UniProtKB/Swiss-Prot annotation:
It comes from Sorangium cellulosum (strain So ce56) (Polyangium cellulosum (strain So ce56)). SUPFAM superfamilies: YhbC-like, C-terminal domain, YhbC-like, N-terminal domain. The keyword Cytoplasm applies. This is Ribosome maturation factor RimP. The keyword Disulfide bond does not apply. InterPro entries: Ribosome_maturation_RimP, RimP_C, RimP_C_sf, RimP_N, RimP_N_sf. Keywords: Cytoplasm, Ribosome biogenesis.
Length: 208
């Protein structure tokens, strides 16, 4: 049964508590979420390597497991979360979500899907194309050769699109093709639940 009440605690204090742990592993926090799943509450940390130059964040499954172990130890000591919960640590994945203006700027030139809360000037609500430079407070996407700019506030969700580089046949030019669905599934490694009083651990690495 899904939990019916939400735990009351300061997620900011959790963020502050885990920051030194992440720094000791040479990773930074991309996102921190407290969510309800069928198995109960989950504290989900998304991490990446400092100065990572790839969309996946440069972290491995082993990195996620190591960070999960040490974060779990700190949270046990600090006792900041009153609920039983699962702890999940993952990389952003090659189809990473774009949440901030800085992330849009970081991945200029990459292909992305941008869902809009309100239609773009041409009526579209889903833009897929190359991310372009845009004035502050806007997002610009090159869609079928046309530049479409929308207010950043109108972006409901945005993700990078992972594209495989196709090997050209003789007489053909090299290009890119979208990854097939079978190659896009998230890979998740789950550890056995710990005997601790409040949480089980999951270290996960999103691959595309």
């Amino acid at each position: 049964m899904e939990p019916s009440t939400r735990a009351v605690f300061d997620l900011g204090r959790v963020r502050d508590a885990v920051a030194p742990v992440l720094a000791s592993h040479g990773v930074t926090l991309v996102d921190l979420e407290w969510i309800t799943e069928r198995a109960g509450w989950t504290l989900r940390l998304t991490i990446e390597r400092e100065n990572a130059d790839d969309a996946g964040g440069g972290v491995t499954l082993e990195d996620c497991a190591d960070v999960s172990r040490d974060v779990s130890s700190v949270l046990d000591v600090e006792d900041l979360i009153p609920n039983h919960y699962n702890l999940e640590v993952s990389s952003p994945g090659l189809d990473r979500r774009l949440r901030t203006a800085a992330e849009f700027a970081r991945f200029l030139g990459r292909t992305a899907k941008v869902k809009l809360a309100r239609p773009a000037p041409d009526g579209q609500r889903l833009l897929r194309g190359e991310l372009l430079e845009a004035p502050e407070g806007q997002v610009a996407v090159l869609v079928d050769g046309k530049r479409i700019a929308v207010p950043f506030a109108d972006v409901a969700e945005a993700r990078l699109v992972f594209e495989l580089t196709a090997q050209p046949k003789k007489g053909q030019r090299q290009g890119k093709e979208p990854a097939k669905e079978s190659g896009q599934k998230k890979q998740l490694a789950e550890a056995a639940p710990r005997s601790g009083s409040k949480r089980s651990e999951r270290g996960s690495e999103k691959r595309k």
